[in-house]
């Protein structure tokens, strides 16, 4: 009986071998055969949308393999001829096979896939069990119809038993044009060589790949081999369009992300530190901040064992060991290890000084310089020496001061071998060469050090930014203000070791010590 138009069976896309042909295939060829059969099955099953379980009854007659099944009121009879071979059961007879189909469509598919692998797996044992026997035909048919595609299992009359099989419905959701409508030819050479590898199996494999992505997304152009995957993919586009910021129009694929983004506009900071009361817009920022209180430093450098609160700090630190400087200046080609360093450097080329002092109007290119300068007006000195309790407005000044106690002088002049406690004073080397690169544009006076030029230039500008809070007197240098301030406080930090007399200024102490040394003053 001819199959109705549009009906497709698994046999239509299967390659069938006789027992003799099968025994002549090597293990690699049998593995390839199994893979192709499994791939055919996957592509047929992918056309299904909502499968349900169905019980079918199979029987056979002595005249041949004649299948009779009942599904509702539908009945169909198909005749098949012996002599060809599709799948081999190695371990046991077909009547012991039981397909445990679950109501879940996916589980049902996996069960059949597992069974097919069993049927085509251990071929060596088949050769032992069936050596000398007549050809046995285990055919797995898979029929598709616009209303009721069915799964069939064919067997010889000796091994027929009731089988549990799966029926796949709703194939009408897929157009006939998307179904597989041709059966590939089987080519076997006389010597059972590799002809079939180069013909039928590879032809089928190519056809499978051509059919794999027949369902295409209109939005992104991405294609899938079944409609269910396409619908799942389309939810991504739906999600992207669902969550939109009503302030700036930016879109997100998660409601949580858009809620977090809106805090940038509203300034909301719902996460509060219980230690200091500081608030944050994200829990991640709060978690990182808490490490400052707990002292936790989970990120450790493998080179020097130095630890950090934040991962970003560790990444920057590692560049010290690697020498990496990924940020390059387009003007002069100089490279930097941090982006902030490059930003500050660029201002040397542009002349930009975005930080302005409201007290004196002086501008700065770096925020750190502006912060230090502002302490001149406020008198703030947050850095304190643990040895003598002296305070400083700059951290670098405290560092230099500590070397007075430790007598450390790490900077050495290559010309004369003299050592210094500050890197700036190392420039004393210019005294050997007589070099004076810093020249005043007003009077052409030159200096070896830039700091001396800046002090000199205040004579022309009459700039005295440093003011005494006691008497209102102004000075051009911080050191001058410091010395003047001792007149009000009576502080005398310089003490003679011989007579314990103290002085406000170091120069006065040096003059006093000449009494003991006998050194005469220069006239």
Curated annotation (Swiss-Prot):
<feature type="zinc finger region" description="C2H2-type 4">
    <location>
        <begin position="299"/>
        <end position="321"/>
    </location>
</feature>
<dbReference type="GO" id="GO:0000981">
    <property type="term" value="F:DNA-binding transcription factor activity, RNA polymerase II-specific"/>
</dbReference>
<feature type="zinc finger region" description="C2H2-type 1; degenerate">
    <location>
        <begin position="215"/>
        <end position="237"/>
    </location>
</feature>
<dbReference type="InterPro" id="IPR036236">
    <property type="entry name" value="Znf_C2H2_sf"/>
</dbReference>
<dbReference type="GO" id="GO:0005634">
    <property type="term" value="C:nucleus"/>
</dbReference>
<keyword id="KW-0863">Zinc-finger</keyword>
<dbReference type="GO" id="GO:0006357">
    <property type="term" value="P:regulation of transcription by RNA polymerase II"/>
</dbReference>
<feature type="zinc finger region" description="C2H2-type 8; atypical">
    <location>
        <begin position="411"/>
        <end position="432"/>
    </location>
</feature>
<feature type="zinc finger region" description="C2H2-type 5">
    <location>
        <begin position="327"/>
        <end position="349"/>
    </location>
</feature>
<keyword id="KW-0539">Nucleus</keyword>
<keyword id="KW-0238">DNA-binding</keyword>
<keyword id="KW-0804">Transcription</keyword>
<dbReference type="InterPro" id="IPR036051">
    <property type="entry name" value="KRAB_dom_sf"/>
</dbReference>
<keyword id="KW-1017">Isopeptide bond</keyword>
<keyword id="KW-0862">Zinc</keyword>
<dbReference type="InterPro" id="IPR050758">
    <property type="entry name" value="Znf_C2H2-type"/>
</dbReference>
<keyword id="KW-0479">Metal-binding</keyword>
<protein>
    <recommendedName>
        <fullName>Zinc finger protein 765</fullName>
    </recommendedName>
</protein>
<dbReference type="Pfam" id="PF01352">
    <property type="entry name" value="KRAB"/>
</dbReference>
<feature type="domain" description="KRAB">
    <location>
        <begin position="8"/>
        <end position="81"/>
    </location>
</feature>
<keyword id="KW-0677">Repeat</keyword>
<dbReference type="GO" id="GO:0000978">
    <property type="term" value="F:RNA polymerase II cis-regulatory region sequence-specific DNA binding"/>
</dbReference>
<feature type="zinc finger region" description="C2H2-type 9">
    <location>
        <begin position="438"/>
        <end position="460"/>
    </location>
</feature>
<dbReference type="InterPro" id="IPR001909">
    <property type="entry name" value="KRAB"/>
</dbReference>
<dbReference type="GO" id="GO:0008270">
    <property type="term" value="F:zinc ion binding"/>
</dbReference>
<feature type="zinc finger region" description="C2H2-type 10">
    <location>
        <begin position="466"/>
        <end position="488"/>
    </location>
</feature>
<comment type="similarity">
    <text>Belongs to the krueppel C2H2-type zinc-finger protein family.</text>
</comment>
<keyword id="KW-0805">Transcription regulation</keyword>
<dbReference type="Pfam" id="PF00096">
    <property type="entry name" value="zf-C2H2"/>
</dbReference>
<comment type="function">
    <text>May be involved in transcriptional regulation.</text>
</comment>
<feature type="zinc finger region" description="C2H2-type 2">
    <location>
        <begin position="243"/>
        <end position="265"/>
    </location>
</feature>
<feature type="zinc finger region" description="C2H2-type 6">
    <location>
        <begin position="355"/>
        <end position="377"/>
    </location>
</feature>
<dbReference type="InterPro" id="IPR013087">
    <property type="entry name" value="Znf_C2H2_type"/>
</dbReference>
<feature type="cross-link" description="Glycyl lysine isopeptide (Lys-Gly) (interchain with G-Cter in SUMO2)">
    <location>
        <position position="205"/>
    </location>
</feature>
<feature type="zinc finger region" description="C2H2-type 7">
    <location>
        <begin position="383"/>
        <end position="405"/>
    </location>
</feature>
<feature type="zinc finger region" description="C2H2-type 11; degenerate">
    <location>
        <begin position="494"/>
        <end position="516"/>
    </location>
</feature>
<feature type="zinc finger region" description="C2H2-type 3">
    <location>
        <begin position="271"/>
        <end position="293"/>
    </location>
</feature>
<keyword id="KW-0832">Ubl conjugation</keyword>
């Amino acid at each position: 009986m001819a199959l109705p138009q549009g009906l497709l069976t698994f046999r239509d896309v299967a390659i069938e071998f006789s027992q003799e042909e099968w025994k002549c295939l090597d293990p690699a060829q049998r593995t390839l055969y199994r893979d192709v059969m499994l791939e055919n099955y996957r592509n047929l099953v992918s056309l299904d949308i909502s499968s349900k379980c169905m019980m079918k009854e199979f029987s056979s007659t002595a005249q041949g393999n004649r299948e009779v099944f009942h599904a509702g009121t539908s009945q169909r009879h198909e005749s098949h001829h012996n002599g060809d071979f599709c799948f081999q059961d190695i371990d046991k007879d077909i009547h012991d096979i039981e397909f445990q189909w679950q109501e879940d469509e996916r589980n049902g598919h996996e069960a059949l896939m597992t069974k097919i692998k069993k049927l085509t797996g251990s071929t060596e044992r088949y050769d032992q069990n069936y050596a000398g026997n007549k050809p046995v035909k285990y055919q797995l048919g898979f029929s598709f119809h616009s209303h009721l595609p069915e799964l069939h299992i064919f067997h010889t009359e000796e091994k027929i038993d009731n089988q549990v099989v799966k029926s796949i419905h709703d194939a009408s959701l897929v157009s006939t044009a998307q179904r597989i409508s041709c059966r590939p030819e089987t080519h076997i050479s006389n010597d059972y060589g590799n002809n079939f590898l180069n013909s039928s199996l590879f032809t089928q494999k190519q056809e499978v790949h051509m059919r794999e992505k027949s369902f295409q997304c209109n939005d992104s152009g991405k294609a899938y081999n079944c409609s269910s995957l396409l619908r799942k993919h389309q939810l991504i586009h739906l999600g992207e369009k669902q969550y939109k910021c009503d302030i700036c129009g930016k879109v997100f694929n998660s409601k949580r992300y858009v809620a977090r983004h809106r805090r940038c506009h509203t300034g909301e900071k719902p996460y509060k530190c219980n230690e200091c009361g500081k608030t944050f817009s994200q829990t991640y920022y709060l978690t990182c901040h808490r490490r400052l209180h707990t002292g936790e430093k989970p990120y450790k450098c493998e080179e020097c064992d130095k630890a950090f609160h934040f991962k970003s700090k560790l990444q920057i630190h590692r560049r010290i060991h690697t020498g990496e400087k990924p940020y390059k200046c387009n003007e002069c080609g100089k490279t930097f290890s941090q982006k902030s360093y490059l930003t500050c450097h660029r201002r040397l080329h542009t002349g930009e000084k975005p930080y302005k002092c409201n007290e004196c109007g002086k501008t700065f290119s770096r925020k750190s310089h502006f912060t230090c300068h502002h302490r001149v007006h406020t008198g703030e000195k947050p850095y304190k020496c643990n040895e003598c309790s002296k305070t400083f407005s700059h951290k670098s000044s405290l560092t230099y001061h500590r070397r007075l106690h430790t007598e450390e002088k790490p900077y050495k002049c290559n010309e004369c071998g003299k050592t210094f406690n500050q890197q700036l004073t190392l420039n004393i080397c210019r005294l050997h060469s007589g070099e004076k690169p810093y020249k005043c544009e007003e009077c052409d006076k030159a200096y070896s050090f830039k700091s001396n030029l800046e002090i000199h230039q205040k004579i022309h500008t009459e700039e005295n930014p440093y003011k005494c809070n006691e008497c209102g007197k102004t000075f051009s240098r911080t050191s001058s203000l410091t010395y003047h301030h001792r007149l009000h406080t009576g502080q005398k930090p310089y003490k003679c070791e011989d007579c314990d007399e103290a002085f406000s200024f170091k120069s006065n102490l040096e003059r006093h010590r000449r009494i003991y040394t006998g050194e005469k003053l220069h006239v």
